[in-house]
A protein has these predicted regions:
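Short coil/turn motifs at secondary-structure junctions
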Residues: 89-91, 108, 141
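GNAT-family acyltransferases
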Residues: 1-100, 168-176
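Conserved GNAT acetyl-CoA-binding A-motif
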Residues: 126-137
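Catalytic cores of nucleotide-sugar-dependent glycosyltransferases that transfer UDP/GDP/TDP-activated
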Residues: 72, 131, 159-162
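Conserved catalytic-core motifs of GNAT/GCN5-like acyltransferases
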Residues: 137-138, 153-171
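Residue-level recognition of the GNAT/N-acetyltransferase active site
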Residues: 102, 106, 139, 162
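Conserved acetyl-CoA-binding loop-helix of GNAT-fold acetyltransferases
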Residues: 102-105, 111-124, 128, 147-151
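Conserved beta-strand-loop-alpha-helix junction that forms the acyl-donor binding cleft
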Residues: 136-146
Protein backbone atom coordinates (compact mmCIF):
# COMPACT_ATOMS: atom_id res chain seq x y z
CA UNK A 1 0.00 0.00 0.00
CA UNK A 2 1.20 3.45 -0.94
CA UNK A 3 2.38 5.61 1.94
CA UNK A 4 1.38 9.25 1.95
CA UNK A 5 2.71 12.08 4.07
CA UNK A 6 0.80 15.20 4.99
CA UNK A 7 3.43 17.87 5.51
CA UNK A 8 2.55 20.98 7.46
CA UNK A 9 3.98 24.17 6.01
CA UNK A 10 5.69 24.00 2.63
CA UNK A 11 9.47 24.13 2.90
CA UNK A 12 12.20 25.16 0.49
CA UNK A 13 12.83 21.46 -0.16
CA UNK A 14 9.55 21.47 -2.11
CA UNK A 15 10.05 24.78 -3.95
CA UNK A 16 10.66 23.19 -7.36
CA UNK A 17 7.69 20.85 -6.97
CA UNK A 18 5.45 23.73 -5.89
CA UNK A 19 6.45 25.56 -9.08
CA UNK A 20 5.66 22.42 -11.13
CA UNK A 21 2.31 22.02 -9.34
CA UNK A 22 1.42 25.62 -10.18
CA UNK A 23 2.51 25.19 -13.82
CA UNK A 24 0.45 22.01 -14.21
CA UNK A 25 -2.67 23.78 -12.92
CA UNK A 26 -2.13 26.84 -15.11
CA UNK A 27 -1.74 24.62 -18.18
CA UNK A 28 -4.77 22.53 -17.21
CA UNK A 29 -6.88 25.61 -16.51
CA UNK A 30 -8.44 24.33 -13.31
CA UNK A 31 -9.09 25.91 -9.96
CA UNK A 32 -6.24 25.75 -7.43
CA UNK A 33 -8.42 25.38 -4.35
CA UNK A 34 -6.57 25.04 -1.07
CA UNK A 35 -3.38 26.67 -2.30
CA UNK A 36 -3.94 30.23 -1.12
CA UNK A 37 -2.39 32.72 -3.58
CA UNK A 38 -0.33 30.17 -5.54
CA UNK A 39 -1.98 31.16 -8.84
CA UNK A 40 -0.69 34.75 -8.58
CA UNK A 41 2.67 34.14 -6.83
CA UNK A 42 5.16 32.87 -9.41
CA UNK A 43 8.19 32.51 -7.14
CA UNK A 44 7.79 29.38 -4.97
CA UNK A 45 10.11 30.82 -2.30
CA UNK A 46 7.87 33.87 -1.99
CA UNK A 47 4.85 31.54 -1.78
CA UNK A 48 6.50 29.52 1.02
CA UNK A 49 7.22 32.73 2.98
CA UNK A 50 3.62 33.84 2.47
CA UNK A 51 2.30 30.51 3.82
CA UNK A 52 4.50 30.86 6.91
CA UNK A 53 3.18 34.38 7.53
CA UNK A 54 -0.42 33.25 7.18
CA UNK A 55 -0.10 30.70 9.96
CA UNK A 56 1.03 33.35 12.44
CA UNK A 57 -1.92 35.46 13.69
CA UNK A 58 0.47 38.39 14.29
CA UNK A 59 1.73 38.35 10.67
CA UNK A 60 -1.30 37.30 8.61
CA UNK A 61 -2.47 40.05 6.22
CA UNK A 62 -5.33 42.06 7.75
CA UNK A 63 -7.98 40.98 5.22
CA UNK A 64 -7.28 37.26 5.84
CA UNK A 65 -7.53 34.81 8.74
CA UNK A 66 -4.75 32.56 10.05
CA UNK A 67 -4.42 29.48 7.86
CA UNK A 68 -2.17 26.43 7.74
CA UNK A 69 -0.96 25.10 4.41
CA UNK A 70 -0.35 21.38 3.91
CA UNK A 71 1.31 19.39 1.15
CA UNK A 72 0.35 15.80 0.34
CA UNK A 73 3.45 13.90 -0.71
CA UNK A 74 3.84 10.30 -1.88
CA UNK A 75 6.56 8.81 0.30
CA UNK A 76 8.23 6.42 -2.18
CA UNK A 77 9.10 9.12 -4.74
CA UNK A 78 8.58 12.29 -2.65
CA UNK A 79 6.17 13.64 -5.29
CA UNK A 80 3.85 16.52 -4.42
CA UNK A 81 0.33 15.21 -5.14
CA UNK A 82 -1.98 17.73 -3.53
CA UNK A 83 -2.40 20.78 -1.35
CA UNK A 84 -4.84 21.55 1.42
CA UNK A 85 -5.39 24.71 3.46
CA UNK A 86 -7.03 24.84 6.89
CA UNK A 87 -8.44 28.24 7.83
CA UNK A 88 -8.51 28.58 11.60
CA UNK A 89 -11.77 30.55 11.73
CA UNK A 90 -14.09 32.51 9.45
CA UNK A 91 -14.39 35.98 8.08
CA UNK A 92 -17.63 36.87 6.25
CA UNK A 93 -16.45 35.57 2.88
CA UNK A 94 -15.09 32.28 4.22
CA UNK A 95 -18.26 31.59 6.17
CA UNK A 96 -20.41 32.02 3.07
CA UNK A 97 -18.27 30.81 0.19
CA UNK A 98 -15.10 28.93 1.23
CA UNK A 99 -15.31 27.24 4.62
CA UNK A 100 -12.51 25.97 6.84
CA UNK A 101 -10.82 23.72 4.29
CA UNK A 102 -9.89 24.00 0.65
CA UNK A 103 -7.96 21.35 -1.25
CA UNK A 104 -6.80 20.25 -4.68
CA UNK A 105 -5.01 17.33 -6.29
CA UNK A 106 -2.75 17.97 -9.25
CA UNK A 107 -4.57 17.12 -12.49
CA UNK A 108 -2.17 14.29 -13.44
CA UNK A 109 -2.82 12.47 -10.14
CA UNK A 110 -6.61 12.67 -9.91
CA UNK A 111 -9.06 9.77 -9.55
CA UNK A 112 -6.68 7.80 -7.34
CA UNK A 113 -8.33 8.53 -3.97
CA UNK A 114 -5.71 11.04 -2.85
CA UNK A 115 -8.17 13.83 -2.00
CA UNK A 116 -10.17 11.55 0.28
CA UNK A 117 -7.00 10.44 2.09
CA UNK A 118 -5.60 13.97 2.32
CA UNK A 119 -8.80 15.34 3.85
CA UNK A 120 -8.94 12.47 6.35
CA UNK A 121 -5.32 13.13 7.34
CA UNK A 122 -6.03 16.85 7.91
CA UNK A 123 -9.06 16.47 10.19
CA UNK A 124 -7.04 15.65 13.36
CA UNK A 125 -5.18 18.96 12.92
CA UNK A 126 -8.54 20.75 12.80
CA UNK A 127 -9.34 19.22 16.20
CA UNK A 128 -5.91 20.27 17.51
CA UNK A 129 -6.61 23.93 16.74
CA UNK A 130 -9.93 23.75 18.58
CA UNK A 131 -12.48 23.21 15.82
CA UNK A 132 -15.42 20.95 16.69
CA UNK A 133 -16.70 20.80 13.13
CA UNK A 134 -15.47 22.03 9.77
CA UNK A 135 -17.30 23.58 6.85
CA UNK A 136 -16.24 22.49 3.37
CA UNK A 137 -17.76 23.72 0.12
CA UNK A 138 -17.56 22.39 -3.40
CA UNK A 139 -18.89 23.58 -6.72
CA UNK A 140 -22.25 22.01 -7.49
CA UNK A 141 -21.53 19.32 -10.05
CA UNK A 142 -18.00 18.54 -8.83
CA UNK A 143 -18.82 14.93 -8.03
CA UNK A 144 -15.22 14.02 -7.19
CA UNK A 145 -15.03 16.63 -4.45
CA UNK A 146 -18.52 15.83 -3.24
CA UNK A 147 -17.59 12.13 -2.89
CA UNK A 148 -14.43 13.12 -1.01
CA UNK A 149 -16.41 15.20 1.49
CA UNK A 150 -19.13 12.56 1.95
CA UNK A 151 -16.52 9.81 2.46
CA UNK A 152 -15.14 11.84 5.36
CA UNK A 153 -18.49 12.26 7.09
CA UNK A 154 -19.74 15.40 5.37
CA UNK A 155 -23.38 16.30 5.98
CA UNK A 156 -25.04 18.49 3.34
CA UNK A 157 -26.39 21.78 4.70
CA UNK A 158 -27.36 23.96 1.74
CA UNK A 159 -26.41 25.32 -1.67
CA UNK A 160 -25.43 28.98 -2.05
CA UNK A 161 -24.69 31.11 -5.09
CA UNK A 162 -21.35 32.90 -5.19
CA UNK A 163 -21.83 35.99 -7.36
CA UNK A 164 -18.12 36.75 -7.99
CA UNK A 165 -17.51 33.45 -9.80
CA UNK A 166 -21.19 32.96 -10.73
CA UNK A 167 -21.24 29.40 -9.36
CA UNK A 168 -23.44 27.42 -7.01
CA UNK A 169 -21.61 25.94 -4.03
CA UNK A 170 -22.72 23.00 -1.91
CA UNK A 171 -22.02 23.42 1.81
CA UNK A 172 -21.10 20.41 3.98
CA UNK A 173 -20.23 20.08 7.66
CA UNK A 174 -17.95 17.41 9.10
CA UNK A 175 -18.17 16.86 12.85
CA UNK A 176 -14.86 16.21 14.53
Amino acid sequence: MEELLLIRQPSVAYADQIAEYRKEFLEYGGSMDGTGPLRRIEDPHEYIRYCQECEDPARVPAHLVPATQFLLVRKNDDKLLGMLQVRHYFNDYLEKYAGHIGYSIRPSERRKGYAKKMLKMALPYCREIGLEKVLILCVDGNTGSEKTILANGGIYESTVHEPDRNVDLKRYWISL
